[in-house]
Structure formats: C-alpha cells, structure tokens
Amino acid sequence: MGEVIVKYKVMLEADSMNRIDDVCNEIDSMDKEIGAVQFVEKKPLAFGLMFIEVTAIIQDGEEFENPLGKFEDLVKSFEGVTEIETLEMGRL
C-alpha cells in the first residue's frame, strides 16, 4: 500500500461563489477513509471568480478500488461544485 499526494483545482458555479467558504469547510472536514485533506485554499481566477485549491493524501494500492475517482466524486457531490481538475500528483 502506498500514498499519493494530489493537488486539485475545484471550480464552483458562478452563482455559487457566495458558498465558497462553506464548500472549503465541507472539503476540509471530509471523511479520512479515502484521503486526508492537507490544505484547502481559495484562489482568484478571473473577473471576481474564485477556485479552491485542495491538496490531499490519498491511499493507493490493490486493496483500494479507484481511490482517486472516489475522492473526486465525493468533492463533486458538494453543492455548487461543477468541476475538479488534477493539477499535480506524486507518490509519497
């Protein structure tokens, strides 16, 4: 079993920007079973829009079935989240 560190860019709907702090808190308090969120930060994108940068350590190995996909699906399930993009990935 190994661990993977992944940095994500999480986009919200334009009309959900007022919920960005709530989404940051939801991501930060995610269940640690799939992955441990290390950092959550709001960053400017353009024209008053923001995105959330998330760094997480995710368990990887044969005993885990698609852990990255499960983590991403969980983030996408939060209200207002439209897209999640992998920015960086590496093994620990």
Provide a role label for each language-model segment.
Residues M1-L92:
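Long, contiguous binding/interaction regions
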